[in-house]
From Swiss-Prot:
Stretches with biased composition (Basic residues): 10-20
Protein name: Small ribosomal subunit protein uS12
Similarity comment text for this entry: Belongs to the universal ribosomal protein uS12 family.
Residues found modified as 3-methylthioaspartic acid: D89
Keyword Methyltransferase among UniProt keywords: no
GO cellular component, one term: small ribosomal subunit
Originating species: Rickettsia rickettsii (strain Sheila Smith)
Function of the protein: With S4 and S5 plays an important role in translational accuracy.
Chain positions covered by the region annotation Disordered: 1-25, 110-129
Positions of transmembrane segments: none
Length: 129
């Protein structure tokens, strides 16, 4: 426990919180260029081939980013937008690629949760009476 004099001289230091997505440098999104597209297997007890991409961000950092949704159009040298967000069963993957931004198309035929997958709203034909 500090003395009163120590508190007057130095004060109390507030603890700094560690960020979960340090490569974004406090930005909500960062653009980058896709270097490699690959599939990885998740931790136990899950089983799948999850799609991830290695991305070089605009601040020269290289990160692994998850590609959400079914089917994707991500290729090498594509410009991508990266947001934070961990994938629970993939160690070392702390970022997501935003679908429907830059060179990446949204998921086709998506009807629910469209904004998460960059899917456009289906046009409804209007009939006149």
């Amino acid at each position: 426990m500090p003395t009163y004099n120590q508190l007057v001289r130095f004060g109390r230091k507030s603890k700094t919180r560690k960020t979960k997505s340090p490569a974004l440098e406090s930005n909500p999104f960062k653009s980058g260029v896709c270097l490699v597209v690959k599939t990885v297997t998740p931790k136990k007890p899950n089983s799948a081939l999850r799609k991830i991409a290695t991305v070089r961000l605009s601040n020269k950092r290289t990160v692994n980013a998850y590609i959400p949704g079914e089917k994707h159009s991500v290729k090498e040298h594509d410009r991508v937008l990266v947001r934070g967000g961990q994938v629970p069963d993939l160690p070392g993957v702390k970022y997501h690629i935003v679908l429907g931004a830059y060179d990446i198309a949204g998921v086709k035929g998506r009807k629910q949760g469209r904004s998460r997958y960059g899917a456009p709203r289906k046009q409804v034909a209007v009939t006149k009476k």
